[in-house]
């Protein structure tokens, strides 16, 4: 093919065609049949800073994420009110999320944390303070209230978090002992119990804080994650995030300087030396202690309903795997109980700290409620081919498959596969594995807790009122437009 172009110009060809992602509204039919589901009161109790394996006490911190994996019943095995609703030979049923309310109990309380040996050498904001000479161990006890975060995110798959961690160096560029390692931005699914960012950054603190003194106790040897909103927004399907709501606030309460050998010196062209060098041992590695400030009910994201009319991705709330992932981050109720117990059974008559044992506990209280709509998917050749491309596991659950190419190799099938007379048969391939079996979630089973009587539940009544329907048992029906066939005599005046 001959192509003419001006001298020195580049010739650009169009990119290769890609598979277009379709909106679920183009092949998922809404039925206007709604169900309500809710949980019991969900409670969790544990130590706010670390877990105690000897007594099987978990770590339950107000600065942790709570990720609920909500299991829904299979609508294709559901007892439907109308048998003519769909044809099982040509259609399959799915759930779509329409409403959600995450309710939280317990009073508001600022989250307080700290470290009994925090890496703070000296006060860096008070210019008149007398500086002490650096020693081998300048750590001090420090407590603080941390960055305040409220976050609610719902999707069909786990939310994606981001954090900074050590990177693999290039070949031949291995850092020497004591050098700063290369770092990179990493991603991982947000699991139940992962730590939020509380004002120190989203980092892998097991690698970044090897002196165990740079961050509060509940961050030691753990990762603090921040939801990767950019990556989830770029996902065309949007399965990991149908929608989210968040509220963050933080300010710096105090500024300190860190202790340690500073190997990255200030360039000489950035400062002038003092005539009397009295600050040769000062540290320029500054850090600020965060504070979330006032906690009030004015800015609460919880205990209120959310309605999903249009998701941020092309999956408009369809739960293909009959499950939902609700990710919650809320440290506005991060109060810690202090429990004092005498060392013996006698009632103390005067205060003596040596005769009292002190314990810490943190408690959390949740309740979830959802509004689901029943939807149908017609099993056309185009729809099956598209689902085979974007979500083949759905067709496997529906027992709908694309015919594989004819086998060219004769395979062997043994009878009595558990017999010792034959070779070992691999049984793991036949068993269906959970794709999230290595992740930790708070499993919630709603497979037997759905109800069509929406007016019997608070969220259901709000949904009915949102659509202009009263809570009366009698449903309003549209007026009949059929003309009357009764012949009436016409009155004539004489």
UniProtKB/Swiss-Prot annotation:
One GO cellular component this record assigns the protein to is: host cell nucleus
**In its keyword annotation, does this UniProt entry include Disulfide bond?**
yes
Location within or outside the cell: Virion; Host nucleus
Q: Where is this region: Disordered?
A: 475-494
Q: Return any one Pfam family short name.
A: Late_protein_L1
InterPro entries found in the cross-reference section: Capsid_L1_Papillomavir, Capsid_L1_sf_Papillomavir, dsDNA_vir_gr_I_capsid
Source organism superkingdom:
Viruses
Q: Which UniProt keywords apply?
A: Capsid protein, Disulfide bond, Host nucleus, Host-virus interaction, Late protein, T=7 icosahedral capsid protein, Viral attachment to host cell, Viral penetration into host cytoplasm, Virion, Virus endocytosis by host, Virus entry into host cell
Q: Does the keyword Protein biosynthesis apply?
A: no
The biased composition feature labelled Basic residues covers 485-494
Please give a single GO biological process term from the UniProt record: endocytosis involved in viral entry into host cell
GO MF terms listed in the record are:
structural molecule activity
Gene3D superfamilies xrefs:
Major capsid L1 (late) superfamily, Papillomavirus
- Function summary: Forms an icosahedral capsid with a T=7 symmetry and a 50 nm diameter. The capsid is composed of 72 pentamers linked to each other by disulfide bonds and associated with L2 proteins. Binds to heparan sulfate proteoglycans on cell surface of basal layer keratinocytes to provide initial virion attachment. This binding mediates a conformational change in the virus capsid that facilitates efficient infection. The virion enters the host cell via endocytosis. During virus trafficking, L1 protein dissociates from the viral DNA and the genomic DNA is released to the host nucleus.
Q: Which family does it belong to?
A: Belongs to the papillomaviridae L1 protein family.
Query: Assembly and interactions?
Result: Self-assembles into homopentamers. The capsid has an icosahedral symmetry and consists of 72 capsomers, with each capsomer being a pentamer of L1. Interacts with the minor capsid protein L2; this interaction is necessary for viral genome encapsidation. Interacts with protein E2; this interaction enhances E2-dependent replication and transcription activation.
Can you say what this protein is called?
A: Major capsid protein L1
* Gene name, Swiss-Prot/TrEMBL: L1
